[in-house]
């Protein structure tokens, strides 16, 4: 009985080992199949990625290719275009160009001769007016004032004055004034009269312009 029990236990153990081996084999096969499937899937993914990349590159090439074709259509010819003229057209006649001869020295000398023939403009010297010494008999007139080139306000003030001869003598009042006035009568002191040989310009500058009408000297009553 014990032997049969031992034999049954051994058979069960062997059966279990075989089952375990089968399970291990199946797991190994499943793992190998899973690995194969994984590799296959990876290959499919890589193939899909490569196809997508190739498709995008093709699309880019398709976009670039028409642009390059358009540029090539704008400039189809790189070399020079020969101008083929028909043989019936006659060539253009060239008109003869007349070149004037250079001026000879004889011709150039004509203006110089003209310049020598035409007299040059001579500048006349400025005439100097003679200055005569002032005498007692002389008196200033309008023409003398204009010749002196005096300022306009001074000339106008003199034009309103009546002409008066210049004399170094002292003028005394009439006898009627002497009879009515006090016994002591002093004449008005005259201004200093310039020398007789002094020119008119210096005499006019020496005098002071008179604003009112010129009258004779009046005596000073003391």
Swiss-Prot record:
Record's signal peptide: 1-15
Modified residues (Phosphoserine): 30, 32-34
Domain of life assignment: Eukaryota
GO cellular component: extracellular space
Residues recorded with modification Phosphothreonine: 27
InterPro entries: Casein, Casein_beta
Tissue: Mammary gland specific. Secreted in milk.
Location(s), subcellular: Secreted
Principal localisation: secreted
UniProt keywords, alphabetically: Milk protein, Phosphoprotein, Secreted, Signal
Record-linked Pfam families: Casein
Family stated for the protein in its record: Belongs to the beta-casein family.
The protein's role, per its UniProt record: Important role in determination of the surface properties of the casein micelles.
Name the record gives this protein: Beta-casein
Originating species: Capra hircus (Goat)
Lineage, highest ranks first: Eukaryota, Metazoa, Chordata, Craniata, Vertebrata
Designated gene of the protein: CSN2
